[in-house]
Amino acid sequence: MVKRSILLLIKVYQYFISPLTGPTCRFYPTCSQYAFEAVMIHGSLKGSCLAVRRILKCHPFHPGGYDPVP
């Protein structure tokens, strides 16, 4: 139940909020796609922790690049 709720929130962000901000993510896959995959693979708790860690790395002083879900 929690996992589905988190995945739904991520999809709402991807379809309705992200298009308004434009492409700003420094990574591939994007942070929202990374979060979706992390929750799908690792579950709601560990996936959310991985997603938060990734989002904290997404800033102008980080080079970005390819960073797949472990």
UniProtKB/Swiss-Prot annotation:
It is found in: Cell inner membrane. Its main location: membrane. It is a peripheral membrane protein. One of its GO terms (cellular component) is plasma membrane. Keywords: Cell inner membrane, Cell membrane, Membrane. InterPro entries: Membr_insert_effic_factor_YidD. The keyword Transport does not apply. Belongs to the UPF0161 family. HAMAP family: UPF0161_YidD. Could be involved in insertion of integral membrane proteins into the membrane. This is Putative membrane protein insertion efficiency factor. It comes from Desulforapulum autotrophicum (strain ATCC 43914 / DSM 3382 / VKM B-1955 / HRM2) (Desulfobacterium autotrophicum). The lineage of its organism: Bacteria, Pseudomonadati, Thermodesulfobacteriota, Desulfobacteria, Desulfobacterales.
